[in-house]
């Protein structure tokens, strides 16, 4: 039942388009105007003063200034100085101190997987940024302390 009514509607529309071409052109113009309006709404209309005054050179200069400020802040205040050099010796006094903190120890740990030294504890001493201050048991008893002061 719907099929004959659809055929009827389509033939009626063709007849209207044929007899009244200006009506079909009006519909086409309305659709065109509607599409133009939608496109206009989608267009970016007001970019603002930031985009209008955009200059890549000044932007790059400002970025460099901000980056140098940030690098200065992080490198000076928060840079942790190395305590050991690349061979695992203390930088402050060039002593090859074992991580057990005994001055005369020849190495009491298993060979380090990175540098093959017997003086490295659980972590390799090469370029390390910290030192053991003391060897303390779980009960809090101090077994050994750092035999000399190491500056920060």
UniProtKB/Swiss-Prot annotation:
Biased composition range(s): Polar residues: 1-16
Region entry Disordered, spans: 1-27
PANTHER family: ADP RIBOSYLATION FACTOR LIKE GTPASE 14 EFFECTOR PROTEIN LIKE (PTHR46536:SF2), ARL14 EFFECTOR PROTEIN (PTHR46536)
Cited InterPro entries: ARF7EP_C
Protein's UniProt name: ARL14 effector protein-like
């Amino acid at each position: 039942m719907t099929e004959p009514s659809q055929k009827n509607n389509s033939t009626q529309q063709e007849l209207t388009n044929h007899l009244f071409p200006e009506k079909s052109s009006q519909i086409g113009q309305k659709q065109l105007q509607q599409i133009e309006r939608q496109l206009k709404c989608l267009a970016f209309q007001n970019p603002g003063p930031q985009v209008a005054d955009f200059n890549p050179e000044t932007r790059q200069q400002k970025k460099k200034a901000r980056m140098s400020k940030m690098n200065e802040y992080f490198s000076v205040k928060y840079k942790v100085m190395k305590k050991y050099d690349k061979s695992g010796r203390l930088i402050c006094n060039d002593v090859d101190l074992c991580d057990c903190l005994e001055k005369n120890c020849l190495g009491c740990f298993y060979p380090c997987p990175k540098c093959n030294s017997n003086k490295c504890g659980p972590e390799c001493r090469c370029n390390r940024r910290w030192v053991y201050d003391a060897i303390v048991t779980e009960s809090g008893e101090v077994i050994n302390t750092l035999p000399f002061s190491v500056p920060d």
